[in-house]
Curated annotation (Swiss-Prot):
InterPro entries in the cross-refs: Circadian_clock_KaiC-rel (IPR051347), Circadian_KaiC_bact (IPR013503), KaiC (IPR030665), KaiC-like_dom (IPR014774), KaiC_C (IPR047222), KaiC_dom (IPR010624), KaiC_N (IPR047221), P-loop_NTPase (IPR027417)
Family: Belongs to the KaiC family.
Positions of the KaiC domain: 1-248, 262-521
Lineage: Bacteria, Bacillati, Cyanobacteriota, Cyanophyceae, Oscillatoriophycideae
Protein name, entry field: Circadian clock oscillator protein KaiC
Species per Swiss-Prot/TrEMBL record: Rippkaea orientalis (strain PCC 8801 / RF-1)
Length: 521
């Protein structure tokens, strides 16, 4: 994602339209800022309470010291230095060690617990001088100030505090340091800052949000402004992991992954034939249909085939437990437990509501990075779509499919439709365009009996069987049979039997059209 870590300024600083930047090494942040934060300028980080402002400020300093050996200064107006150091330990950052090494200095400007009385006119002259002294003494190149909102809350004269904040920003710019200044806002979508600080710190503005969408909260980061340089527009989802902030720059993803002509087996011989010899390696397959149509069975056969060939595979299940998946698979002659014992299969089961979509995406990426599978399956996408917006869900699917293709992994996903019989939409969340192959499964009623139908609805770059075939499920798995040759309107859910005379008449018409075409030629 980033350039190789180096202490040389040549590799840590970037020039974009005359503005030099320093990489933050925060996952995804350097992508959406097109190279990091502008050097020698102050960036305002605004957000409501709990959005991760302080975390971003601390991570910015820690990474600068760790990766580039840039000394840093942290000015705190809210938390005590002890709390900041203790909280950083949760992410594996030993701030006390770098403080002892003289690479980080924490300047405590937090309120006096015994209270304080302001006599006469208020100014930050003494604090500004302390900050300048610390910058010069420790040769600090990076500064984080958290948070200027606390200064306004301590003193009544807001206009005077604005003036003093402006003086502080001007001094930081004069000293040539790259700084982050956090501020709090009241609403997720409203004024940038609570006290109009953005009027003075307007070169660069980053907005962090934690919005309740549907039934779940969703964190996003937006680069509102980077004066004099380019950046990506819009909101980008992020999550907070054990390593700190992790942004998913979905808009930065490029369609540059390689495409293989190699085929892999689905684990079902007849389905391979319907797909022209199997699925393309590195492709994304979607099986969609009502509950009970056999989607999980197809996924199980797909994973079994991969493990049979010595490939590693991961199943991310969001509807069934490990025990239930293993039991059901065993009833079809598939031994998931044996595959796990051999180290070829990994089953990961969790409720969709246990985390946000960004957290699920991060877990999927981490597990893939650690286990290095050739095949993955998600059962099912529709479970993850519950309680979230279409846009958030689509971004999640793009993130998963993009990462799978980048890692050259074949993905098999399932989607449960609401409609039990008949035609159903597979484009409600716009995921059909993201997948390479779509397999439609559905129930059909023929002569008073319920049957199952399977159809390869779409397959990019390959011939595939257009027929709608009947299939059944027994103890050995799925059995795909011939097409419903004597029926039409299967997909609509209202199959109609075609009589022999009608078939002959249709054949005669087709022959007549062909003969007429040949005569004209």
């Amino acid at each position: 994602m980033n350039e190789p870590i180096s202490n040389s300024s040549k590799k840590t600083e970037n020039t974009t339209q005359g503005v030099r930047k320093i990489r933050t090494m925060i996952e995804g942040f350097d992508e959406i800022t097109h190279g990091g934060l502008p050097i020698g300028r102050t960036t305002l980080v605004s957000g409501t309470s709990g959005t991760g402002k302080t975390l971003l400020a601390v991570q910015f300093l820690y990474h600068g010291i760790k990766y580039f050996d840039y000394p840093g200064l942290f000015v705190t107006f809210e938390e005590s230095p002890t709390d900041i150091i203790q909280n950083a330990y949760s992410f594996g950052w030993d701030l006390q060690e770098i403080v002892d090494e003289g690479k980080l200095f924490i300047l405590d400007a937090s309120p006096d617990p015994d209270g304080q009385e302001v006599v006469g006119s208020f100014d930050l002259s003494a604090l500004i001088e302390r900050i300048q002294y610390a910058i010069n003494k420790y040769k600090a190149q990076l500064v984080s100030i958290d948070s200027v909102t606390a200064v306004f809350q301590q003193y009544d004269a807001a206009s005077v505090v604005r003036r003093e904040i402006f003086r502080l920003v001007a001094r930081l710019k004069l000293l040539g340091v790259t700084s982050i200044m956090t501020t709090e806002r009241i609403e997720e979508y409203g004024p940038i800052a609570r006290y109009g600080v953005e009027e003075f710190v307007s070169d660069n503005v980053v907005v962090l949000r934690n919005v309740l969408e549907g039934e779940r909260r969703r964190r996003t980061a937006e680069i509102l402004k980077l004066r004099g340089t380019t950046h990506m527009k819009g909101e980008y989802p992020f999550t907070i992991t054990n390593d700190g902030i992790n942004i998913f720059p979905l808009g930065a993803m490029r369609l540059t992954q390689r495409s293989s002509n190699a085929r892999i087996s689905s684990g079902v011989k007849t389905l391979d034939e319907m797909c022209g010899g199997g699925f393309f390696k590195d492709s994304i397959i979607l099986a969609t249909g009502a509950t009970g149509t056999g989607k999980t069975l197809l996924v199980s056969k797909f994973l079994e085939e991969g493990c049979r060939q010595g490939e590693r595979a991961i199943l991310f299940a969001y509807e069934e437990s490990r025990a239930q998946l293993s039991r059901n698979a065993f009833s079809w002659g598939i031994d998931f437990e044996e595959m796990e014992r051999k180290g070829l299969l990994k089953l990961l089961c969790s409720y969709p509501e246990s985390a946000g979509l960004e957290d699920h995406l991060q877990i999927i990426k981490s597990e893939i990075s650690e286990f290095k599978p050739s095949r993955i399956a998600i059962d099912s996408l529709s479970a993850l779509a519950r309680g979230v917006t279409n846009n958030a869900f689509r971004q999640f699917v793009i993130g998963v499919t993009g990462y799978a293709k980048q890692e050259e992994i074949t993905g098999f996903f399932t989607n449960t439709t609401d409609q039990f019989m008949g035609a159903h939409s597979i484009t409600e969340s716009h995921i059909s365009t993201i997948t390479d192959t779509i397999i439609m499964l559905q129930y059909v009623e023929i002569r008073g009996e319920m049957s199952r139908a399977i159809n390869v609805f779409k397959m990019r770059g390959s011939w595939h069987d257009k027929g709608i075939r009947e299939y059944s499920i027994n103890e050995s798995g799925p059995t795909i049979q011939d097409s419903f040759r004597n029926y039409e309107r299967i997909i609509s859910g209202s199959p109609t039997r075609i009589t022999v005379d009608e078939k002959n008449e249709l054949s005669r018409i087709v022959r007549g059209v062909k003969d007429k075409t040949l005569d004209e030629e």
